């Protein structure tokens, strides 16, 4: 298995990682901005292409062209069979995790395993909504151990109107902050 550890932001860069990680074969550690931009994450495509040179699954365009697409129901493990598994572990905020997921989604490469170590800004006393939603440990050492060795559990990926992955939470508001009238539709079901 190849493991990419993405240290997003100063607080994540200051986290002390086990010495064994620095010497482990197949583990690469990257220091990135607190919320990495598309250009900061280009290297992810190099890794996904190397480990899965040809993706046998239909592209988004091919799926959209089909007259009937099966309902997906519950999330499942990705069907792709890479040369070796790839686990990407994000150390950082919910926004950093969203940025990484967005990059993978836009590259049509959502097959790697994703781990998350919530690293919050102590000065702002932030809490990771993603960690709370997924019952992840908030202690960085425990979260890192789970991210490195835990069992993969597929979860749905939610994106906003701008095509960005939402990790944690999002709000729906009017541009001016006023009352909002409308409805939320997921597939064929009206939620609100």
Give the role of each language-model region.
Residues 1-24:
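N-terminal amphipathic/basic leader segments beginning at the initiator methionine
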Residues 2, 86-87:
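Structural motif
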Residues 9, 30-46, 50-82, 91-98, ...:
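Catalytic core of DAGKc-family lipid kinases
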Residues 17-18, 101-103:
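Short amphipathic alpha-helical segments
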